[in-house]
A protein has these predicted regions:
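Acidic catalytic cores of enzymes that act on phosphate-bearing nucleotides/polynucleotides
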Residues: 224-243
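A generic local structural motif
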Residues: 2-5, 91-95
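Metal-dependent phosphoesterase signature
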Residues: 72-93
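Generic marker of residues within folded, mature protein domains
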Residues: 8-9, 25, 47
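Broad, structure-driven detector of short, well-ordered beta-strand segments within folded domains
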Residues: 19-21, 38
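Short acidic, Gly/Ser-rich segments with clustered Asp/Glu that frequently serve as metal-coordination loops
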Residues: 21-28
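N-terminal accessory regions of nucleic-acid-interacting proteins
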Residues: 1-19
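Metal-dependent phosphoesterase core characteristic of DEDDh/y 3'-5' exonuclease domains
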Residues: 14, 28-32, 36-73, 98-229
Length: 243
């Protein structure tokens, strides 16, 4: 099976929900929520990106946005006052939008989005608490998955925008726009799977700096000890089992 580890995380889902939040600078209170969701067949990784379910809204907050966040996102207090909804309303919107799909997988790039939700919801409100619990239960951190396979020359994780460059992904919009970032996340997911040769080349690029490859290195060492040699194809085969 191609991408066996990824398949275990994704295959049961009927709906893949790629989402991104923006938050205030200091207290990480949610100020914008975007998602793009796609129906797929069970036991499949790939889906058609036609007829997506899209959602975006600003979220009102009493917290200070912060100058750095305002500069990066273009979101101001006036934006939230004029265009924002309460987080509770946003949660109701999203719940209604996705209600027909029992098996969902929520995908973001890094668990900061989960932390933002955790900091922002009213934990005494059953609707909001259940919303967070449902996402957390069915959550896949795509950043962590990629970090265990593809790193930079310093052994560090790549940003989602760096992956967009590597896979030559083009979407309208700009960084730190949650609609744009959600689409880039979806495109990166699809490119990672569809462009397998390119993906393997990215893994090889800084393979020696990837601390997560310990198990692969041990398996390769065992092959050398048992057979006296190991070829590049042996490494590729081991890596394919790790995808």
């Amino acid at each position: 099976m191609d991408f066996p580890i990824l398949s275990k995380k994704i295959r049961k889902a009927q709906l893949l929900v790629f989402f991104d939040l923006e938050a205030t600078q200091i207290n990480h209170q949610a100020i914008a929520f975007a998602l793009t969701a796609y129906k797929k067949e069970k036991d499949q990784l790939i889906f058609s990106d036609k007829d997506p379910i899209n959602y975006f809204n600003y979220i009102r907050t009493n917290d200070e946005i912060g100058p750095i966040v305002e500069e990066m996102t273009g979101i101001t207090k006036d934006t939230l006052t004029e265009k924002g909804k309460s987080l509770h309303e946003v949660i109701l919107d999203i719940s209604k939008l996705l209600r027909h799909f029992k098996d969902r997988c929520f995908i973001s790039y890094g668990n900061l989005d989960i932390e933002i939700l955790n900091r922002s919801i009213d934990h005494n409100n059953e609707t909001e608490e259940n919303f967070l619990r449902n996402i957390t239960k069915n959550y896949f951190n795509f950043q962590q998955y990629l970090y265990e396979r593809i790193v930079d020359k310093n052994g560090s994780a790549l940003s989602i925008h760096k992956f967009a460059e590597k896979y030559n992904i083009k979407e309208e919009g700009k960084k730190h726009d949650p609609c744009y970032d959600s689409l880039v996340l979806k495109d990166t997911y699809l490119s990672y799977i569809k462009e397998k040769e390119k993906t393997l080349s990215f893994i090889f690029e800084n393979y020696s700096h990837n601390r997560a490859m310990t198990s692969i290195n041990k398996a390769l060492t065992m092959k050398v000890l048992e057979e006296g040699k190991a070829e590049k194809d042996d490494l590729i085969h081991l890596l394919e089992e790790y995808l």
